[in-house]
Regions:
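C-terminal catalytic domain of Rieske-type non-heme iron oxygenases
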Residues: 1-239
Length: 239
């Protein structure tokens, strides 16, 4: 474990769960990720209580036009795999597969064992919702675990817990366990660009849901995971 942070947010915990269970917000909330991942055509799987979607990394979003030079996010992905972007001679469309092949071929010298992972798991994000309030972003080299906790006194607030786990190469020393870091509401300390961007929407979303003019949500097919989540909660409340 390399990180352990709790932030107090001005929204209900279920709004936070929803924010990490659909991908269409990427274009507006995380525009930098359009140069790094596929955000339109995602596999969505629903289970009895849980759900997931699979996000291909190492591809340009169909929302952006291809450019001549490899964009910085894809260069970072190449470097993260141990490759030199300057020496990469393939096309941009082949970066995802090239990273998969390189990580597979060099796993032993990198001190890692990917033998039980298929190729897509070497690059992509496997985003799970473990009902009712745990989200994981699962990758070959790391795991980001989020817990969305109700506030004990105020339904318009919540606690967002972040744990970061990283795969330590064989033979390397494990880093010391991080100390728990608490961020009260209004803190300007960053949780990381992507999480900060998600958090920036949630207080406004909560205000909108509290409006007298808000009758309820109409959820589209893109929001299958949200529909499944709230249906499961309703089923529990009706028991």
């Amino acid at each position: 474990m390399t990180r352990w942070v709790t932030a107090e947010w001005n929204c209900n915990w279920k709004a936070s769960v929803d924010a990490f269970a659909e991908s269409y917000h990427t274009a507006q909330t995380h525009p930098q990720l359009l140069w790094y991942l596929e955000d339109l055509d995602l596999q969505i799987d629903l289970y009895e209580k849980h759900s997931r979607y699979l996000v291909p990394f190492g591809l340009l979003s169909p929302r952006v036009d291809s450019v001549g030079e490899i964009p910085p996010p894809l260069k970072a992905m190449l470097r993260g795999a141990g490759m030199d972007p300057a020496s990469y001679e393939g096309s941009m469309n082949d970066i995802r597969v090239a990273v998969q092949q390189y990580k597979r071929a060099t796993q032993e010298e990198q001190g890692k064992d990917f033998s039980e992972l298929h190729d897509e798991q070497l690059t992509d994000d496997y985003n799970y919702l473990v009902f009712p309030n745990v989200t994981t972003n699962t990758h070959s080299d790391d795991l980001m675990l989020f817990r969305h906790r109700p506030h004990p006194d105020d339904p318009n607030k919540m606690f967002f817990d972040v744990w970061m786990f990283e795969l330590i190469p064989e033979g390397e020393e494990w880093p010391p366990l991080p100390k728990h870091d608490f961020r009260p509401a209004g803190s300007t300390r960053s949780l990381g660009m992507v999480i900060d961007q998600d958090a920036s929407n949630l207080a406004t979303v909560q205000e909108g849901m509290n409006s007298a003019g808000f009758p309820g949500l109409w959820l589209s097919d893109q929001e299958l995971r949200l529909r499944h989540f709230h249906k499961t909660i309703s089923d529990y409340l009706e028991e």
